[in-house]
């Protein structure tokens, strides 16, 4: 990072304000369907992270954030997805400082509208292509972008989580495309509504695809680089067989890794009645 200092002066050249900022430079691009960062293939050994602490709930402090980053580095985690909402502002500065890649997710999740009794049934889904929702979801995308657009650590803008796909999310995708800020757009929902796969998301994204399913996609004239936005559901005593995914990184350049679900088990400390 570089220390940048912006001086704001009035028409008489009198200093009004000084704005310091830590900025960085990086180049993100897709070449032959492979994502490259500064000329090198991007490999994500990432994690999904909710904002949570057993005693404070979602009201975490910078102390907990720094502990998280320390554990990231100890466990070779190089990326984080802000599932499923923008996080506290200090977290983005800390990821800039620590060199942690970010997938900055927009605050949108509606899988209860198109998944009914565990089955995909999208006859009515939100936001879908409902005109009344369009401006609302674009507003959420704009809030995410305008708040965090200057953070070097953000490589991906994510349109949300498990919200199917329709014209409204396509409009969100177009909003981020119009910013032309050198980042990539991610959205997993097109994997369940393929009619939008050429209109939404610059990466193929899946949740909990098996290694064989990843291999099958990449062996069949794949259209986009592949990112697992959630995989290896590792709550409790699990995470076995992860080498099956890691081996794919060596065989398929288009497989870029992913984000384990999830960082820590979210639990609450309660005191039993005496």
Where are these regions (language model features)?
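N-terminal carbohydrate-binding accessory modules
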Residues: 7-72
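Substrate-binding/catalytic cleft of secreted carbohydrate-active enzymes
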Residues: 69-72, 79-271
